[in-house]
């Protein structure tokens, strides 16, 4: 009897206090975990994944810091010169000459190019060269066939505004940042609060060499956002000029959608770059690349519905639904509407899983 403690006395022991503190911590962790929405942003290279992530930051009012804008400023310069270098290399490969022979004098600038220091204006000798080269019909002939050579699709946006970009006081606008290309290597995480939940979005490198790293993000994923460029139906891969972007995306979606890792994971399909797709179908035949397409090549609605159906048919699980949306990652207002619907889908499915 003397060895027995009353309930009141036992509450004062260090062991009891540690146990109660541990219980509180577990409950708090469970509460935080239930509030966390973990999204995996996947897709083949050039699909616009990183642009979607940047648009989400704008939508949810996560500003770009001064340091980030400075990094993007220097990236814009690299986008300008590397895009032109791609075209010049293809001109040599395809034996295409300059219309204006004097443009040969600019080639030395693209053997190597300077690293832009912090706050250093872009070199003005490149402004003259880029203007001259962009107007050359030899350059334009390659640009018009850019789908065959993985020419960046942001070039026309930047090259129509070179004077602004080369201004000594230039600071990238949100539109400049959205269109700035920077190959995703490894895993980039972005976190933001929304509707009493914390969203953690992981952008994973899309090129083939990056895909082996995806495995580290698979556990406890709430949803997969899979991004595909509709405009890639006639385009080659950056890393493999003999492979088609859309075919690559279809194969990748098949493996992701039907993976054991995602058996109970919501699958959100972003059919992206609808703006570029609408322009392309006016002159680039879908049937040439996808002979089973039986619609009018220039029928925008029929064409995009065809590709939506191609992806949805890959789902082999009767218990899994695909939620497709047509997007333009550089149109923040459109993406805001799409993301509102996506959020409803994710939270509804999340609640269903908790109940089950």
UniProtKB/Swiss-Prot annotation:
Q: Where is the G-alpha domain?
A: 35-356
Q: Which cofactor does it need?
A: Mg(2+)
Its subunit composition reads: G proteins are composed of 3 units; alpha, beta and gamma. The alpha chain contains the guanine nucleotide binding site.
User: What organism is the protein native to?
Assistant: Mycosarcoma maydis
Asked whether the keyword Nucleotide-binding is assigned, the reply is yes
- From the UniProt entry, list the residue stretches annotated as the region G5 motif: 327-332
Query: Which InterPro entries does this one have?
Result: Fungi_Gprotein_alpha, Gprotein_alpha_su, GproteinA_insert, P-loop_NTPase
Under Gene Ontology molecular function, one entry of this record is: metal ion binding
- Identification of the protein by name: Guanine nucleotide-binding protein alpha-2 subunit
Record-stated family: Belongs to the G-alpha family.
- Domain of life, per lineage: Eukaryota
Q: Which gene encodes it?
A: GPA2
């Amino acid at each position: 009897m003397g060895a027995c403690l009353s309930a009141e006395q036992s509450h004062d022991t260090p062991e009891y206090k540690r146990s109660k503190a541990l219980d509180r911590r577990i409950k708090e962790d469970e509460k935080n975990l239930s509030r966390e929405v973990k999204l995996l942003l996947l897709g083949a290279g050039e699909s616009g994944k990183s642009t979607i992530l940047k648009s989400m930051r704008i939508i949810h009012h996560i500003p770009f810091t001064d340091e980030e804008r400075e990094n993007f400023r220097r990236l814009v310069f690299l986008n300008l010169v590397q895009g032109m270098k791609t075209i010049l290399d293809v001109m040599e490969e395809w034996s295409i000459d300059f219309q204006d022979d004097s443009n040969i004098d600019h080639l030395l600038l693209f053997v190597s190019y300077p690293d832009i220091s912090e706050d250093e204006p872009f070199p003005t000798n490149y402004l003259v060269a880029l203007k001259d080269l962009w107007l050359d019909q030899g350059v334009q002939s390659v640009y018009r066939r850019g789908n065959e050579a993985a020419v960046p699709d942001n070039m026309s946006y930047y090259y129509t505004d070179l004077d602004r970009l080369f201004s000594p006081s230039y600071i990238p606008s949100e539109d400049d940042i959205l269109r700035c290309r920077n190959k995703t290597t490894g895993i980039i995480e972005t976190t933001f609060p929304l509707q009493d939940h914390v969203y953690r979005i992981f952008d994973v490198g899309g090129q083939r060499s990056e895909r082996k790293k995806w495995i580290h993000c698979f556990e406890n994923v709430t949803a997969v956002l899979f991004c595909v460029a509709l405009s890639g139906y006639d385009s080659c891969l950056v890393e493999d000029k003999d492979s088609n972007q859309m075919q690559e995306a279809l194969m990748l979606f098949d493996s992701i959608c039907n993976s054991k890792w995602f058996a109970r994971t919501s699958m959100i399909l972003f059919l992206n770059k609808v703006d570029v797709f609408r322009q392309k179908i006016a002159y680039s035949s879908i049937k040439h690349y996808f002979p089973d397409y039986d619609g009018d090549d220039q029928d925008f609605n029929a064409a995009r519905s065809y590709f939506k159906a191609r992806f949805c048919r890959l789902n082999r699980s009767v218990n899994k639904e695909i939620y497709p949306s047509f997007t333009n990652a550089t149109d923040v207002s459109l993406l805001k509407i799409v993301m509102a619907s996506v959020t409803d889908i994710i939270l509804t499915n999340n609640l269903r899983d908790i109940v089950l």
